[in-house]
Amino acid sequence: MSGWDDYIKLLFGKSPAIKRAAIIGSDGSVWARSGDANAFRATEVELKRFAALFNDINSVPGTGADLEEIHYIVPRVEEKLIFGKKEQTGFFAAKTNQAIVIAMYEGDNAQSASVRAGVEYIAQYLASSGY
């Protein structure tokens, strides 16, 4: 297990609603991803496109975002955060200087708050560590 995998485990511990997760570089390269029954299945092409969304984050609500071959509407973005939703599933992604933390979740809007908090916690820690 790499050190990056430990951050994935920590992220899962932040919310039971998190089903899959990854940490990618700002270029879309995979640093760590959940596996086995909770395998994060986004392709290399998807992740490169997804990482590029942060270059023009304010346009993302108009176009949405694709992960794991699913198109999500994006009702909200913030400076370094994208929130995607489709029915009872969604994702939060937070960008640091070098990394993007992504958590895919299942559940209602009330559960999404803990997912967001977990993603932001990991992202803030990575940013404070120089990533």
UniProtKB/Swiss-Prot annotation:
Disulfide topology: none
Subcellular location as annotated: Cytoplasm, Cytoskeleton
SMART domains (alphabetical): PROF
Pfam family, one: Profilin
Keyword annotations of the record: Actin-binding, Cytoplasm, Cytoskeleton
Cellular component terms (Gene Ontology): cell cortex; cytoskeleton
Transmembrane parts of this sequence: none
Superkingdom of this protein's organism: Eukaryota
Keyword Disulfide bond included in the entry's annotation: no
Any one GO BP annotation for this protein: muscle thin filament assembly
Keyword Cytoplasm: yes
Principal localisation: cytoplasm
GO molecular function, one term: actin monomer binding
Tissue: Expressed in the intestinal wall, the spermatheca, and the pharynx.
Subunit comment: Occurs in many kinds of cells as a complex with monomeric actin in a 1:1 ratio.
Family as reported in the entry's similarity comment: Belongs to the profilin family.
Role: Binds to actin and affects the structure of the cytoskeleton. At high concentrations, profilin prevents the polymerization of actin, whereas it enhances it at low concentrations. By binding to PIP2, it inhibits the formation of IP3 and DG.
Protein name as it appears in the record: Profilin-2
